[in-house]
Structure formats: C-alpha cells, structure tokens
Amino acid sequence: LNTACTSAANGLLYGARMLAADLYRRVLVLAFETPSAIAQQGFGALGLVSPSGEYRPFHPQRDGLVLGEAYAATLLALEPGPAPLARLLGGFSACDTSSLTNTREDGSHIEWVMREALHSAKVSAGQIGLVKPHGTATGANDRAECNGVRRLFGDALPPLCVLKPWLGH
C-alpha cells in the first residue's frame, strides 16, 4: 500500500477494517520510509525540498520539507494482549481532488477529514491533546493546515507536533 505521506496511517485503518470484518484475529502493519533519489528528485521537481536543509514548518522563514527515514511495526488485534501500548479508536482518510499535489488553502478539506476521524473514533475535538500535522514546511500546505486546525478547534488549539524529518515522508 503506497499512499505517500499517509501510507502508515492508511495501513492502520485497513488493518482495523480487516479485523472488524473478522477476516483475521491479528494484523501486522509494517511501515517504512527510506530516502531515495527518486523521492528527492520528485519532491525537488515540485519545488518542495528545503534548499537550506533546515526544517521550519509554520515558520515565516520556512523553505520546504526535509525528508526523513523511519521504520515501524504495529500489531493490531481485537483482543489486546496483557499490556497493550495503545488503542486505535477510529480514523478516516480521503483525497482532496481539487489538486494533484495540494489541498484547499482555506482548510475546509482538512477540517472535514479531521471531523470524520473524530466521529469515527467517537471523540470530540475538546478531547484532543495533541495534533500531528502533515508539516511539509511549504507555504500552501502550512496555510491549509493552519486554517483546517483553526476551523476545527477555534481558539482552543492543542499543541502541534511535526515529525516529518524523523518519521519520513
């Protein structure tokens, strides 16, 4: 499964769906991002890679993303073992078809996806203690994410944690 930045999250959602459909008792989700010349050239051609190499999402002097490397494995099960580390309450994924490489800068699509995810998890926006945005450190994406988060949370913004260089694209 490759859905670019959302591959690992979509892997978790698909795994959860397989469990809910009673296809499996356990699902192992493996995710990785390995730096490659193809990725670097692709993002470079789009003008998204930081020429300075400094990662500054949501900063006035941001100049693009810094690609990272990460590997992860998560075992999903309907019946947790003796010490589960986390619970997947729900989630939602969608593509913004308004553009091939961007999302709507007004944040409406991002807000909609977050609302659907909260609804799926049966959680309210007020219960969220941390938001991990996409964080490409590009003007259009930063504006879209800021607007989407602001539309959902209003003035009660939870902290943001951006991890792209440490978790990969």
Regions found by a protein language model. Name each.
Residues 1-31, 67-82, 169:
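Active-site-proximal alpha-helical scaffold in enzymes
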Residues 1-3, 59-63, 160-169:
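Short pre-catalytic strand/loop immediately N-terminal to key active-site residues, enriched for Gly-Thr
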Residues 1-3, 35-40, 125-143:
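Conserved beta-ketoacyl condensing-enzyme motif
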Residues 3-7, 31-36, 92-96, 135-137, ...:
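Acidic, glycine-rich active-site loops and adjacent beta-strand->loop/helix elements
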Residues 7, 11, 113-121, 152:
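Stable alpha-helical structural segments in soluble proteins, enriched in small hydrophobic residues
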Residues 40-52, 144-160:
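Acidic-glycine-rich active-site phosphate/pyrophosphate-binding loop
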Residues 53-121, 129-130:
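Condensing-enzyme catalytic core mediating Claisen C-C bond formation in acyl metabolism
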Residues 100-106, 136-153:
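Short glycine/threonine-rich loop-to-helix capping motif typified by GTGT followed
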